[in-house]
């Protein structure tokens, strides 16, 4: 098979487990990798690697479509989404599909359409994956040079990076267009308990949007996770989309500078490690977002955040005892602090009791009762609306606590229910995946650096014990 470049020249970049230099075939003898090493067998077979990636995309999209339809089939409109263990429908509802005031589901047909579209797309991707894995050319360099590449070709690699950045930027703008022109998105802060609305007054001020990045990650600061209005979220996507698209064009048109050529390792395994590191960071950030943010992840669909459930409990009992005649402004608790209300370290009026630690919670059902100095006593006495009482009672009993056996609630609660918040699942899964992706990043970065330096520590695959054992079949 004709190749356009010397294999010997580039092969040291990948850490192969034996010295074989032939690229034909996908078995251990010809690639140095056994079948279980997966795509490592395809390092120099760009056509087959394309097939593996397209097929993988097909599996992902198939899961999305099938799980989407599964959730639609099991969905009970009378119960909140977070009580039904749903993780996909809340995302569709947040985008404004099928929901009305208060987050009430009015139409499940858009969810059905989403599932079917993903299934159809997965069939197309699956066919493409099978075609390129089994029938298409092994390498793309000869027949389709635009799609071919050599891992060490720095200019080609940054061009591919640029194309990816442009696609990410277009993805960010899809959300912007949905929010501005195509029906709007769900705003949990809309008056009266949330509604779908078009975003009309985008925040584009760089001082506001990039100010989030400069905030402390702790307490009431909360870094970017503290964003609490949709104008900022959609405006942020305008900025990010623009930066990604402009950066993509830049990377397509330019070649890497000398310092970048020297500083970075230029091999397939190095790019894998960079990607895993980025995905790890995304996973950890997503974990914090779904844990604490009730604007991007509205509580109507995902259930309350931990602080929100705690504050809801204090609010619920304040309402109850006030009706029973308690003077909530002056009643003392067992420690001598206020039983229902007290002051924060900075002087605001906040809920008393154990929930004082969550005093900087902001939630749409609570904010109308605040004044310039925290909770307003006169509003608490006169202005509490029935929807606020209903919502806080609901959130109080649905804290995002839970265990692997799906018995939710506080660990010491004897009346525990079979409920685990989607917030718990999404936060935990993204934390665990973020951690494992970070380990993968370290592993592949170490191998890529070792290969670039011309040495590798590891098992000699030519004399591995398993090679002398009888095959399983």
Curated annotation (Swiss-Prot):
Pfam families documented for this protein: PSII
Propeptide boundaries: 1-14
UniProt GO BP: photosynthetic electron transport in photosystem II
Residue list for modification N-acetylthreonine: 15
Entry-annotated residues carrying Phosphothreonine: 15
Record's bilayer topology term: Multi-pass membrane protein
Cleavable signal peptide: none
Subcellular location as annotated: Plastid, Chloroplast thylakoid membrane
UniProt main location, coarse: plastid
InterPro entries, per database record: PS_antenna-like, PS_II_antenna-like_sf, PSII_PsbC, PSII_PsbC_sf
One GO MF term: metal ion binding
Keywords: Acetylation, Chlorophyll, Chloroplast, Chromophore, Manganese, Membrane, Metal-binding, Phosphoprotein, Photosynthesis, Photosystem II, Plastid, Thylakoid, Transmembrane, Transmembrane helix
GO CC term (a single one): chloroplast thylakoid membrane
Residues annotated as transmembrane: 69-93, 134-155, 178-200, 255-275, 291-312, 447-471
Entry note: cofactor: Binds multiple chlorophylls and provides some of the ligands for the Ca-4Mn-5O cluster of the oxygen-evolving complex. It may also provide a ligand for a Cl- that is required for oxygen evolution. PSII binds additional chlorophylls, carotenoids and specific lipids.
Family matches, as Gene3D superfamilies: photosystem ii from thermosynechococcus elongatus (1.10.10.670)
Ligand binding ([CaMn4O5] cluster): 367
Family membership noted in the UniProt record: Belongs to the PsbB/PsbC family. PsbC subfamily.
Subunit details: PSII is composed of 1 copy each of membrane proteins PsbA, PsbB, PsbC, PsbD, PsbE, PsbF, PsbH, PsbI, PsbJ, PsbK, PsbL, PsbM, PsbT, PsbX, PsbY, PsbZ, Psb30/Ycf12, at least 3 peripheral proteins of the oxygen-evolving complex and a large number of cofactors. It forms dimeric complexes.
Function per UniProt: One of the components of the core complex of photosystem II (PSII). It binds chlorophyll and helps catalyze the primary light-induced photochemical processes of PSII. PSII is a light-driven water:plastoquinone oxidoreductase, using light energy to abstract electrons from H(2)O, generating O(2) and a proton gradient subsequently used for ATP formation.
Name this polypeptide is given: Photosystem II CP43 reaction center protein
Taxonomic placement: Eukaryota, Viridiplantae, Streptophyta, Embryophyta, Tracheophyta
Gene: psbC
């Amino acid at each position: 098979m004709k190749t356009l470049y010397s294999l010997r020249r580039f092969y040291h970049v990948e850490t192969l487990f034996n010295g074989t230099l032939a690229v034909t075939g996908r078995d251990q003898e010809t690639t140095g990798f056994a079948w279980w090493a997966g795509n490592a067998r395809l390092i120099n077979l760009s056509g087959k690697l394309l097939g593996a990636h397209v097929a993988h995309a097909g599996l992902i999209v198939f899961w999305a479509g099938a799980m989407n339809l599964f959730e639609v089939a099991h969905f009970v409109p009378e119960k909140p989404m977070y009580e039904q263990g749903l993780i996909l429908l809340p995302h569709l509802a947040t985008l404004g599909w099928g929901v009305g005031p208060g987050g009430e589901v009015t139409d499940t047909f858009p969810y059905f359409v989403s599932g079917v579209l993903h299934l159809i797309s997965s069939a197309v991707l699956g066919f493409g994956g099978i075609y390129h894995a089994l029938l298409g050319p092994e390498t793309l360099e000869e027949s389709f040079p635009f799609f071919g590449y050599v891992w060490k070709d720095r200019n080609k690699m940054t061009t591919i990076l640029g194309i990816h950045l442009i696609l990410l930027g277009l993805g960010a703008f899809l959300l912007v267009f949905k929010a501005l022109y195509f029906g709007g998105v769900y705003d949990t802060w809309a008056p009266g308990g949330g509604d779908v609305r078009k975003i009309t007054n985008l925040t584009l001020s760089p001082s506001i949007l990039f100010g989030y990045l400069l905030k402390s990650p702790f307490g009431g600061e909360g870094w970017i996770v503290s964003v609490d209005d949709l104008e900022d979220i959609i405006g942020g996507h305008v900025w990010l989309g623009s930066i990604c698209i402009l950066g993509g064009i830049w990377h397509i048109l330019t070649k890497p500078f000398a310092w970048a050529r020297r500083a970075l390792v230029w091999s397939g395994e190095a790019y894998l490690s960079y990607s895993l590191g980025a995905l790890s960071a995304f996973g950890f950030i997503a974990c914090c977002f779904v844990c604490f943010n009730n604007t991007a992840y509205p509580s109507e669909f995902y259930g309350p955040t931990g602080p929100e459930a705690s504050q809801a409990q204090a609010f619920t009992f304040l309402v109850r005892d006030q009706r029973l005649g308690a003077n909530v402004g002056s009643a003392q608790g067992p420690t001598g602090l206020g039983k229902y209300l007290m002051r924060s370290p900075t002087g605001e009026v906040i809920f008393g009791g154990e929930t004082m630690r969550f005093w900087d919670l902001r939630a749409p059902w609570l904010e109308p009762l605040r004044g310039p100095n925290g909770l307003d006593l006169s509003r608490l006495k006169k202005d509490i609306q029935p929807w606020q009482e209903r919502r806080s009672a609901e959130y109080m009993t649905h804290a995002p606590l839970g265990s692997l056996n799906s018995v939710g609630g506080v660990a010491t609660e004897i009346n525990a229910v079979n409920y685990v918040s989607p917030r718990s699942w999404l936060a935990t899964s993204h934390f665990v995946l973020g951690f494992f992706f970070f380990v993968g990043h370290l592993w592949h970065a170490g191998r890529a650096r070792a290969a670039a330096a011309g040495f590798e520590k590891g098992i000699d695959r030519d004399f591995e014990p398993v090679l002398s054992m009888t095959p399983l079949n």
